[in-house]
């Protein structure tokens, strides 16, 4: 994260691991797979070279995905624990997914996603920042504390406000290690806020060597548990939640849930499309869109889409994108009424909408951009790589 590129040594190591993994897949006669790249590869300057090297040297086709897609997968994996999930999100609930490059906080109320926000608070990113600044080991928790406080203050003022959060659902790689090996009640997945805070406080007071021995993990990974514990504790303090549920979900579970749904192996009872629309409506509310007008535009757009379905042949996914465009078509007026469509384009492109790929966000942004002006067929330049959507 500090250098902005992946070294050839790491590329060699990745290729070696992937080659060995491919051999394991052959042993089990695996017929299909999914390989995704998250923030480390997505943000690297040499990402395309690395992806090409992996494909040539291992035969593995890696698909880079944006943060909103990645978090949506994890969210689906949590929702796959159907009964517990539905019961938990009936009251004010937050899902906190702490990753290596960033963290995601999603707020629920009465079974509906209210808002979701990505924060640049990843355990590896924070650890590398502390190392780059040559921070004294004993000062690392204090420095990370300050970085986390700064990000959470903005989130609290903009998104949390007076919302009451009763439950916290904690997901991510680090929380699994922290709980499975660090808490005496390892056979449980629910804890009171006080129990969880006490555990996090104990972990942050340990040295990396002590964590390495106690958790029986490698030294490099042991160093990542400290920022993880700080993030979870700080978020819990900010939310004021009473209980913590740790379902043991990580990104791999999310990938499996996504694949199972696409292959029609499982069917979710939760309305994920409703969550995406709810997120868009809350975004429109934040930018002071006129609700009555927006609702009428959305209703008319959907009616026209449905009435002309036999002519355009588009799917329900395209209808969802049209709905989002209708909901957000006036958000640019928050910045300037005279150039509202151009401003709306910039706002949508700068905002992650959970569950949408970068290409889908570009489609929505361009539909809004050319809402009241002539469509420039030769003027639209998309950033997305179409090869992964073919």
Residue ranges, per PLM feature:
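Post-signal peptide N-terminal segment of secreted/secretory-pathway proteins
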Residues: 32-33
């Amino acid at each position: 994260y500090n250098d902005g590129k992946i070294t050839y040594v790491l590329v060699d190591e990745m290729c070696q691991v992937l080659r060995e993994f491919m051999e394991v897949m052959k042993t089990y006669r695996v017929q299909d797979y999914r390989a995704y790249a998250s923030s480390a590869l997505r943000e690297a300057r040499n990402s395309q070279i690395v992806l090409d090297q992996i494909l040539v040297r291992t035969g593995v086709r890696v698909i880079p995905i944006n943060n909103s897609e990645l978090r949506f997968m994890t969210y689906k994996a949590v929702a796959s624990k159907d009964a517990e999930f539905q019961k938990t999100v009936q009251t004010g609930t937050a899902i906190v997914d702490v990753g290596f490059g960033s963290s995601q906080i999603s707020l629920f109320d009465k079974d509906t996603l209210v808002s979701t926000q990505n924060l640049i608070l990843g355990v590896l990113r924070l650890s590398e920042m502390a190392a780059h600044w040559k921070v004294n080991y004993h000062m690392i928790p204090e420095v990370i504390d300050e970085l986390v406080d700064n990000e959470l203050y903005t989130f609290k003022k903009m998104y949390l406000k007076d919302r009451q959060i009763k439950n916290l659902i904690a997901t991510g790689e680090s929380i699994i290690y922290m709980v499975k090996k660090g808490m005496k009640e390892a056979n449980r997945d629910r804890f009171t806020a006080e129990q969880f805070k006490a555990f996090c406080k104990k972990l942050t007071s340990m040295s990396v060597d002590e964590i390495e021995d106690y958790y029986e993990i490698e030294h490099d990974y042991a160093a990542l548990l400290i920022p993880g514990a700080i993030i979870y504790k700080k978020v819990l303090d900010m939310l004021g939640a009473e209980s913590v549920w740790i379902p043991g979900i990580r990104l791999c579970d999310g990938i499996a849930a996504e694949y199972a749904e696409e292959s029609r192996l499982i069917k979710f009872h939760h309305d994920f499309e409703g969550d995406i629309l709810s997120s868009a409506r809350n975004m429109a509310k934040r930018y002071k869109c006129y609700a009555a007008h927006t609702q009428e535009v959305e209703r008319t757009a959907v009616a026209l889409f449905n009435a002309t379905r036999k002519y355009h042949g588009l799917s329900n996914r395209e209808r969802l994108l049209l709905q989002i465009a209708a909901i957000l078509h006036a958000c640019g007026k928050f910045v300037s009424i005279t150039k509202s469509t151009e401003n709306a384009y910039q706002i949508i492109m700068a905002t992650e909408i959970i569950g949408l790929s970068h290409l889908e966000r570009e489609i929505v942004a361009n539909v809004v951009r050319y809402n009241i002006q002539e469509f420039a067929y030769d003027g639209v330049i998309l950033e997305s790589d179409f090869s992964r959507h073919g």
